[in-house]
Curated annotation (Swiss-Prot):
GO terms for MF: nuclease activity
GO biological process annotation, one example: rRNA 5'-end processing
SUPFAM superfamilies for the chain: Ribonuclease H-like
Enzyme class: hydrolase
Pfam families in UniProt: RuvX (PF03652)
Gene Ontology cellular component terms for the protein in this record: cytosol
NCBIfam families in UniProt: RNAse_H_YqgF
Record family assignment: Belongs to the YqgF nuclease family.
Alphabetized InterPro entries for the sequence: RNaseH-like_sf, YqgF, YqgF/RNaseH-like_dom, YqgF/RNaseH-like_dom_sf
Predominant location category: cytoplasm
Gene3D superfamilies: YqgF/RNase H-like domain (3.30.420.140)
Protein's name according to its UniProt entry: Putative pre-16S rRNA nuclease
Length: 156
């Protein structure tokens, strides 16, 4: 199910199980995982978007292997908070994922995360080619970190 309220999402999570975060793009999908205590987010992987079936199968394998209990998906909205074409694409992907997995899904505003991730990697002198391969996973970890920080802030 797709949950719009963070407190409700948190109530549906299984204790001592990690979360997965997804930065969904048309060419690449960034993936991040939390630890079991939901205290830190780590970039995990970047999946090439061959087609939705391959992407969902790859995500399902990660979810099963790491016993993930919930999914955070970055929701791309424009700077004024409006819906874009990519917003609708991500919403459709979230619906497909919901049907395939049955885990709670929370959509998190992802404004500027990919740009921030790219700047972060650039600050370490990482070359453009390597940044472009890793920025989506780092962006996914930033999206997940926003959620984890909100959980801590609200003492959930």
């Amino acid at each position: 199910m797709i949950i719009k309220n963070l407190q409700e999402f948190y109530r549906l999570l299984i204790p001592n199980k990690p979360l997965i975060a997804i930065d969904y793009g048309s060419k690449k999908i960034g993936v991040a995982l939390s630890d079991q205590e939901l205290s830190i987010a780590m970039p995990f992987n970047t999946i090439t978007a061959v087609n939705k079936k391959v992407v969902i199968t790859s995500l399902l394998n990660i979810i099963k292997k790491y016993k993930v209990c919930g999914i955070v998906i970055g929701l791309p909205i424009d700077m004024s908070g409006g819906v874009t074409q990519q917003t609708n694409i991500v919403m459709k992907f979230a619906e497909k994922l919901k049907q395939s997995l049955g885990l709670p899904i929370y959509l998190q505003d992802e404004r500027l995360t990919t740009k921030s991730a790219n700047n972060f990697l650039k600050s370490f002198g990482i070359k453009r080619k390597d940044r472009n391969h890793n920025d989506d996973a780092v962006a996914a970890s930033m999206i997940l970190e926003i959620v984890l920080n909100a959980i801590k802030r609200f003492n959930l």
